[in-house]
Amino acid sequence: MSGFNGTSTSSNSILSERQKDELHKSILDYFKTNNLHESFATLMREANQEGFVPDPRAKYAGLLEKKWTSVIRLQKKIMEMESRISQLQEELSAAPSAKRSASLNDWLPAASSARHTMQGHRLPVTKVSFHPVFSQIASASEDTTVKLWDWETGDFERTLKGHTKAVQDVDFDSKGNYVLSCSSDLSIKVWDANNDYKNIKTLQGHDHSVSSVRFLPGDDYIVSASRDKTIKIWEFSTGFCTKTLQGHAEWVRSAIPSDDAKWLVSCSTDQTARVWDVSSGETKVELRGHEHVVEVAIFAPVASYAAIRQLASLDPNASKDASASMAGQFVATGSRDKTIRIWDSISGQCLKTLTGHDNWVRGLAFSPNGKSLLSVSDDKTMRLWDLQSGRCTRTIEAHQHFATGIAWGKAKIEAPIPPAQDGEEAGRKQPEARTVNVVATSSVDLTIKIWTP
C-alpha cells in the first residue's frame, strides 16, 4: 500500500498536494463505504490521514465512483466521435474536392438537418451559445439554470446553479475558459470551466433585470444590458464597472460588440437601436424605423458587406467613412413589428426591410460566408434570407412553441492543403480555416435544437 502515500510518490508527480489529499480521502471514503476495513486502516496510516472521518456531505464523498463513471462516459464519447470521424472521412474521400469545399462553405440549415433535440430545462430556454473550440453548447433558461451539452452527441453534461431568477443570456470567452450568465436577479455570474465550473465572480450594479451579457473581443471586458435602461462595461479581472452608457428611454434588450471591440450595437423597448463608441461611451448613431420593441441587433460580418452593398444598390467600391471601423459598417435588427431591417451604421439609414415572419422576430445570425441571414421568431420558424436579394429562401418549422434564440457555431476547422498540381510550387499556403457548420435554436417549448449537415 506504500504507493498510496503522498510522501513516497515521485517528485515529479502531476498531482498537487491538495489533489493528492483529495484523492486519498476519496479512496478512504470508497473503502469505508464498501466495508474494506483492512485496506481503509492501511491507507489511513500510510497516507497520514489518521484523523479521517467519512462525511457524506463532503466533496470527496462518492467522488471515486463519479470519476470512474465519467471516464467510462468519456471513453464512450471518444469511440462515438472516432466512428463519426471515420464516417466523415469516408464521405469526404468520396466527394470531389472542389465540390466538397463549395458545399461545406455554402451549407445552410434545412428541415432535414435537425440532428438533436436536447431536453432538460423545466422552463423556456432563452438563449444558446457555442464553445469556441469544443463541441459544447451552453443554454440559459427561465428555470434559473445554465446547462451545458455536447452538441455532437446530443448528451447533457452538467447544470450550473446559482441564479435565483430567470437566466436571460449566456456567453463563452474566446478560449472557452469561462462562461458568463446574466439574470432577472440583477446579477452577472462568471463560471470557471477549469475549476469544475465554479461560480468565481458575481457582478452586481444593475438596478433591474440583466437581459444581455457578452465578452468583448480580447476577453478583458464584459458588456451587459439591462431593463434599468443602461448598458454597463465591466473589467473582467476585477469585476468593477468601468463605464455606464445611457441614452435609451426604455429597457435595453441587448448590447453586442463588433468583432474589433470598438463599437456596440444595442436595441431597446423604445423601438430604436443604437451604435455606441466603446472608448468614449457616446452614441454614434440612432437607428429609428421599427414600429415596436426591437428584440435583437447584431453587427454584420465583413464577409457579408459585398452582398449587403448589392442588396442596397450601393457602390461596391465606395470607400467607407473614416469614422467607421471595418467591423461595424452594417447592422441587422429584428423587432416585434415582425420585420428585420438592415442598416448602414454610419448614416443611420435603413437599407432594406425583410418581411415574412408572422410574429415577433427574436433572434438573428449571419452565415459565416456572408451570403445569408438566419432568423427565428415567435411564429415558431427559422427563416433563411438571401442577402443579395433580400428574399426569404427557406422557412423551417423549427419548434413547437416560440423560438427565442439562434447561434452559429464558433469553432474553426482547418482546411486541408490541396494537392499540388503540375507546375505548382510546393509549400503552398494553408487555406483559411472555416467556421464549423452547426446551428442551434432555443425555444419556449423547453428544447434546444441542433442543426448540422
Swiss-Prot record:
Compartments in which it is found: Cytoplasm, Cytoskeleton; Cytoplasm, Cytoskeleton, Spindle pole
Residues of the signal peptide: none
PROSITE patterns in the record: LISH (PS50896), WD_REPEATS_1 (PS00678), WD_REPEATS_2 (PS50082), WD_REPEATS_REGION (PS50294)
Stretches forming WD repeats: 120-161, 162-201, 205-244, 247-286, 314-355, 356-395, 413-452
Domain LisH: 19-51
A biological-process GO annotation: microtubule sliding
Coiled-coil intervals, chain numbering: 69-96
Gene3D superfamilies xref list: 1.20.960.30, YVTN repeat-like/Quinoprotein amine dehydrogenase
GO cellular component: cytoplasmic microtubule; kinetochore; microtubule associated complex; nuclear envelope; spindle pole
Family statement drawn from the similarity comment of this UniProt entry: Belongs to the WD repeat LIS1/nudF family.
Function: Positively regulates the activity of the minus-end directed microtubule motor protein dynein. May enhance dynein-mediated microtubule sliding by targeting dynein to the microtubule plus end. Required for nuclear migration during vegetative growth as well as development. Required for localization of dynein to the mitotic spindle poles. Recruits additional proteins to the dynein complex at SPBs. Required for retrograde early endosome (EE) transport from the hyphal tip.
Protein name: Nuclear distribution protein PAC1
Species of the source: Mycosarcoma maydis
